[in-house]
Amino acid sequence: MNKIILTDCDGVLLNWEGAFTNWMSMRGYKVDENNRREYHMGKRYSISSEEKDRIVRAFNESAWMKYLNPLRDAVYYVDLLHRKHGYTFHMCTSLTTDEYAQKLRIENIERLFGKTAFTKYIFCDTGADKDEALEPYRDSGYLWVEDKFE
């Protein structure tokens, strides 16, 4: 049995939301207090869907991708599963198709989780659905870890 875990990145491994909140604040955007817990960033900031798409893409293609903090206990559990139990991870994320932003994301993952825990990186465009990218894993029996419930 291959000991592989498929995982999303933002909201599972990295604190994308916290970094995005700081990035937006530095640019003068304020969270709509009535929508503070909203998953959809357009609603959270009371901006149009088009503006949200443009802003999220700009953030995802920024140098911030190299410096996102890990989410809660992600480093501990990835390390435990990798070193003690022999699992490796394949990451699938809707970051961007920009190759330089992707390199920054990989550098950050390797800095936080080490160079051997993640053996494959799959990048989809900003906000894109991951179904097509995950199709090769259908019926593999691998665990898929995702923060967006659907």
Where are the model-predicted features located?
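Active-site neighborhood of HAD-like aspartate-dependent phosphohydrolases
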Residues: 1-54
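Conserved acidic residues
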Residues: 3, 119, 141-143
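Short hydrophobic segments within beta-strands
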Residues: 8, 92-94, 145
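Short, solvent-exposed loop/turn segments at secondary-structure junctions
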Residues: 11-13, 19-20, 94-99, 127-129, ...
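Metal-dependent phosphoesterase signature
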Residues: 30-31, 39-79, 85
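A short, structured active-site edge motif that brings together acidic residues
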Residues: 35, 90-97, 106, 112-132
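Substrate-recognition element of Asp-dependent hydrolases with the DxDx(T/V) motif
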Residues: 65-70, 74-105, 109
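Conserved Lys-Pro-Asp/Glu-containing loop-to-beta segment of HAD-superfamily phosphomonoesterases
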Residues: 123-150
